[in-house]
Amino acid sequence: MAFSHAPSGWRTALLAGLIATVAWLPAIVAQEKTQADYFIHDLPGAPKPLLKMHAGHIEVDAEHNGNLFFWHYQNRHIADRQRTVLWLNGGPGCSSMDGAMMEIGPYRVREGGKLEYNNGSWDEFANLLFVDQPVGTGFSYVNTDSYLTELDQMAAHMVIFLEKWFALFPEYENDDLYIAGESYAGQHIPYIARAILDRNKKNQAKSPWPLKGLLIGNGWMSPVDQYLSYIPFAYQNGLMRSGTDMAKRVEEQQRICVQKLEAGGMDAVDTRDCEQIMVRILQETKNENADPMNQCLNMYDIRLRDDSSCGMNWPPDLAQVTPYLRRADVVQALHINTDKKTGWQECNGAVSSHFRAKNSKPSVKFLPEVIEQVPVLLFSGDKDFICNHVGTEAMIQNLQWNGGKGFEASPGVQNAKQDWMFEGEAAGTWQEARNLTYVVFYNSSHMVPFDYPRRTRDMLDRFMGVNIEAIGGAPADSLIDGEKGPLTSVGDHPNSTKAEEDKSKELKAAEWKAYTRSGEVALVIAVIVACICGFLLCRSRRAKSAYKGDDSDEGRESLLTGMGLDNFRRKERRQDVEAADFDERELDEVPKKSGKGYGQISSEKGRVPHNDSSFSLGVDSDDDEAGSSDRGRRKEESR
């Protein structure tokens, strides 16, 4: 016999302990990722020099494999202080890569996967953090039975994400934090802001996050005001004329909507019968005898016409962005987890169809409380139909905050709109009162930064209080009511050497702290393993001195096999994260549409057909597990 019965017990126990420790190591290592694990070493198609970027997943729900994807760009220049902008797109279920690759990010995708610098990107004086949320959106993922349903759930996930993200990147935790986005993010952003403010008040032991402002473009905040704005907007812009049969049919749909609202729908985030007002206008204005690509009004930009999808093919950059983000080398560069089984799609219909928000109230209900604590800027492109400026202005006019109603300077006296000139052209209007700013962009769509990146950058810098006077550079030609105000700059310019040196020291200290923390974990693990091995060796020597036996390997082999060590090494645990194989297809062109009817959309783009009775304000995908009659109704104010 190779081993006596006495030592066999403790050897088995200790070996089992060693195996458990080894099994524990991957989990520890996975949890203790460092910045280096997220660093983007190379981005296909990007011009040189490469910007400093990090990307990857952060787990927010271990039980259901909920992981949020982020893409972070470090600012190019430092003004008087560090600032971070968290950008979120709408949907619910539309990827923030829209913002990164088509709006405010430093790169735009051109033919052949070539990236070009975006003239007017928001990363000049601010770090940019794009997050695909809720879970399941874009590159984010979750078990297919665990999509979110309420706005409070979404906000809780974002707080968890930020806690973990700041632990990984502590150098940014004290930055002035701004949250920006558009469309359905008009619900996301106020909910997240409220959750952050609550977190700052309750968690005294934790460092408060300095939330300094919110920016919401063409936001879906007050459903009632937005529903009732469709007819006035259509009249103002000549989409239909009052008194016509067309107008009467649309007005009848509005009467049905009002009945639903009065019957308890005032607190709903969306109401199906009210969504049909815009649907009816699009139906009534459709010209089926026109060229197939010019039959329907583009709901995101009324200056444009589209096929029967009425704007779902827009913006045109999407034809380049989608195949780029599905490329295997791009997926690898962005550190996409292998648990993410499906290729990137702009909008996920499964996320949208589950996110009903039936127990959530519209963000407008508590927006005044947020404005009391945080400056808010709302901006609107005046050619957007789906979340149009008429509805936003009605919401503001009806809103009471900080001791007044609407933009009144005193009871009955309104703060006047100020003309905004940018680089010699009329850019829009600017209006402020009691911590709220409202900006209208002339000749602009649902995605204002897509149309005017330089103008939105000027707006951002004014709102954040960036002043380049202390650091040099040519100021932008920007006037509000004929006055320059703080000097802003849109373009390359020198940086503040002192600010850069001070920040460099802070970054190095924070990075050293992060690396030290991961080193301490590795040291603890090494000590545990060394102690177990040492104890094994010591007991082995004692046993040999007291007893001699067969020194063959037969006994050891029997022990290892009996404990199932080989099986342990081969064992692989799989979970149903997403029920599909990874799709690396490259879309060389926008698929041709069949033109079979209103809202017919090619599944190649991940969007589903809509029938005449229901229309999605955004885009659904073939991931949608709901019935086809439900797929169309979700409000995807889209991008």
From Swiss-Prot:
Answer whether the UniProt record assigns the keyword Disulfide bond to this protein: no
The residues on the Cytoplasmic side of the membrane are: 539-639
**Residues carrying sugar:** 119, 435, 443, 495
Gene Ontology molecular-function annotations: serine-type carboxypeptidase activity
Q: Where is the active site?
A: 183, 384, 446
* Membrane topology according to the record: Single-pass type I membrane protein
Q: Please give a single GO biological process term from the UniProt record.
A: proteolysis
Entry annotated with the keyword Transport: no
List where this protein forms a coiled coil.
Answer: none
Task: Give the reaction(s) catalysed.
Answer: Preferential release of a C-terminal arginine or lysine residue
Q: Name one GO cellular component term.
A: membrane
Query: Which segments cross the bilayer?
Result: 518-538
Q: Give start-end positions of Basic and acidic residues composition bias.
A: 628-639
Output the Pfam families linked to this UniProt entry: Peptidase_S10
Q: Where in the cell is it found?
A: Golgi apparatus, trans-Golgi network membrane
Q: Where is this region: Disordered?
A: 477-504, 580-639
Q: Which UniProt keywords apply?
A: Apoptosis, Carboxypeptidase, Glycoprotein, Golgi apparatus, Hydrolase, Membrane, Protease, Signal, Transmembrane, Transmembrane helix
Which N-terminal residues, if any, form the signal peptide? Answer: 1-30
Q: Which family does it belong to?
A: Belongs to the peptidase S10 family.
User: Function, please?
Assistant: Protease with a carboxypeptidase B-like function involved in the C-terminal processing of the lysine and arginine residues from protein precursors. Promotes cell fusion and is involved in the programmed cell death.
Name used for this protein in its record: Pheromone-processing carboxypeptidase kex1
Which source organism? Pyrenophora tritici-repentis (strain Pt-1C-BFP) (Wheat tan spot fungus)
Which gene carries the instructions for this protein? kex1
